[in-house]
A protein has these predicted regions:
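N-terminal/domain-start alpha-helical segments
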Residues: 1-87
Length: 87
């Protein structure tokens, strides 16, 4: 299984990468919207997406990546406002 990790926090991105690789998954990393557009393709089976990227909204990015293939996603956010979490 190939998992795309789109997270701007280096420490969290590396922790997710290490944990998933230790469990046998293949990962593709991106630290920004721009990197995700460049690195993530339709070969991924799951996306882990930070909602608050420095160069764009993670939800809009996810919708853009969905154009060629429907990919399930887990969204991450550091925001604790209920409105943001329900988004």
């Amino acid at each position: 299984m190939r998992i795309g990790i789109i997270e701007d926090d280096n420490l969290l991105r590396k922790a997710l990468d290490t944990s998933l690789k230790n469990q046998g998954y293949t990962t593709i990393l991106a630290g920004s919207r721009k990197e995700a557009i460049k690195n993530i393709d339709s070969s991924v089976d799951l996306l882990i997406v930070d909602i608050g990227l420095p160069d764009g909204d993670g939800i809009n990015l996810y919708q853009e990546l969905q154009k060629n293939k429907k990919i399930p996603a887990i969204f991450l956010t550091a925001k604790d406002d209920e409105k943001d979490m329900l988004k």
